[in-house]
Structures are given as C-alpha cells and as structure tokens.
Amino acid sequence: MTAAVAALAVMGWVRAPGEGHASRPQARHLQMGKGEAYPYQSGGFTRFVSDSYREADGGQTADFYAWMDKACLQSNLCAPGSGQMLAMIDARRDALGAIASPKQRAQAEMALAATLHHWIKSSMPIFSLQEGFEFSNVAKHRERQCLLQSVLLASLLQEADIDAGVVMVNKNAGGQTSNNGHCVALLKLSDGTDVLVDASDRQPFVRHQGLFAKDAVLKNYRYVEPVFQGDTPIIVSYQSPDHAVKIPDRPLRPLDTDFLRSQFDFYRGERTSGGLLDAHPTDNGLAREAHYLRSSVHACPQNPLPVYMLGRVEWRRTHTGEARRQLSRAARLYQEAGWVPSGLRAAQHDAHMAFSAPSPSPA
C-alpha cells in the first residue's frame, strides 16, 4: 500500500487492502433543490452519459463507468481490493458524516474536492473544446472540457453528500468577460461559505469574478459577482453586477439538470463541422447546428446562450424573421438575468434591429 493510499485509509477516505465494502445507505442526508441532484451513477448523471453515447458511434454507458473504475484504481485513488470509484466515494461520504463540526467538515469537503480536481486533470489530461464535452470521449481518448469536468466533479461530490453543482462563468479571475464562456463547479460548504473548483486551472480553488447561477428565491437565472473573504477563494456572499444588490449565498444555487442538458446540446451545436465557427460554414453544417441549438432551447428555454446563437445561425442561413425573433428573445433573457454581452448588440445591429437592452459589458 502506497504512503498516499495509507494516509487516505487512516482518514477513512478509502478502504485499506482486504477490507470489505460497506453497504450503501438507502437514504441520503443531502437535500437539494428540484432538478439539482445527479450524484455519480444515479439516473440523473447516467442520463448525461447515455445522451453522449447516443451521439457517439458505438459504445455504451457501461464503457464509461468501467473506464472510471480502472482509472481510479490505476491512480491509487481507489485502494487495491476495492477497485470501484463508487466504493471510494461512499467511503469518503461515511467519513464526512462522522464530522460534527461544520468548520472541520467544510475543510474536509474542500480536501476531497482538491483530490478529485487533481485526479480529473491527471486521468483525463487532454482538454478538447472540439470533443471534450462528450462522456464517450473520456473512455476513448481521455478527453475533457469545462462542462464535462464540472458535471463529473459535482456528481462525485454529491455522491459524497456535499452540496455541489455547476455554474457558468462570464468574468474570469483576471476580469476578462465572455458570453458564459466557461463552467466551474460550485461547492456550498457545510460552514455556510462557497468555493469554486475549476479543473481547467492548476489550482483547485479559483476566484472568478462573474457567475451565472440559479436564484432559489426568484426562481430564475441571474448574473452575480462573488464577494470573497480577503484574498482567499472563500465566497461569503454575492452581489449584482452593478453592485446595487447584495445577495446572501444560501439562496444562490447551482444550475439545474435541464440547464446542463441544454448546455451539452449547445456545445454539440457550436462544434458541429460546417457550423458557424467553422472556417467554411456549409448549408448542411448550419442546419445541423440549428438542430442542436433548438434541442438546447427546448431543454431549457431560459438558457440565453443557445437562443442567442440560434439567432446568429438563422441569420447566416438567411432566415431573417426567425433570426430577429431569437435575438429579441435572447436580449430579454440576458436583461432579466442582469447582464448583456456586447456580442448581442453586434448581432442585432447586423440583423438591422433596434437594441433595447441596457448597455452591455464587454464580451
């Protein structure tokens, strides 16, 4: 047994060689909002995986789970004799459940998140914008992308009874804005604070400055800016992008599964060969991209990004009326969420539309 595995075994986070598997409890103490839960190997998480394999040529969800178990064992994250990712996570859940102090449990939650952050980066070393959002490509090519890695990390943490999910990033740690151009995991720790975990960064905990998340009180999506504790990555509260409204951290929730399914289809459309981002868009490519974007909008009509991109694609296809309709709808969604990207103004200008939303931030 390696020193690393021995240390984890002492902490109760993996089982030492020869130990049997504890039976999994039937009830989970973690209470999450509607549509927020997708713990590892649950029906909610497996749907993400099966959707991916449906898009792939061959393979099945069992291939992904088999790869995960093998990679867990090869990395020494799973102790010899257990060999299953699920068993490892369940052992850590049991250890977390024995911690009475919210502060100490929060520290242990962050330690597990950091361990999984390292494991994902080392086991899936290839970051691919083109294909890394498909779970089928984890097993085939060891690829990942920001949405996939964040959903996977959140699912593993949820299985350990940690309140975790995914949020979009519209302003990174350096202050650069984008149109929801990145995804990270959000951990709502037991001591009442939050942290962001980004498997695209060398360090597990990051200080991104603008997020797109779910407001549990208003029941809608909104843009917020985290308020950090000094120079640490600990989030103590949130505020609106104009700093006019202070938002307690508890009502701010991760994005729901409808939104996440929508976002997977958005990336499938965005990365379609011959689509809008291609150097040489084709009629067939644009039609296929529009198909995925419509599927994305259908999964979550309140996700503004696919609505915006659908408007741009339809404009390129010379479907002028439909393009204007989608761009107008996107403008309303962004405005309601509290932030408008400058790219929307440019798209509406190209479509000869009057821009009625507030002045956008650069993106």
Where are these regions (language model features)?
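Secondary-structure boundary elements
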Residues: D51-V138
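Hydrophobic/aromatic-rich core segments of domains that either
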Residues: V151-R222
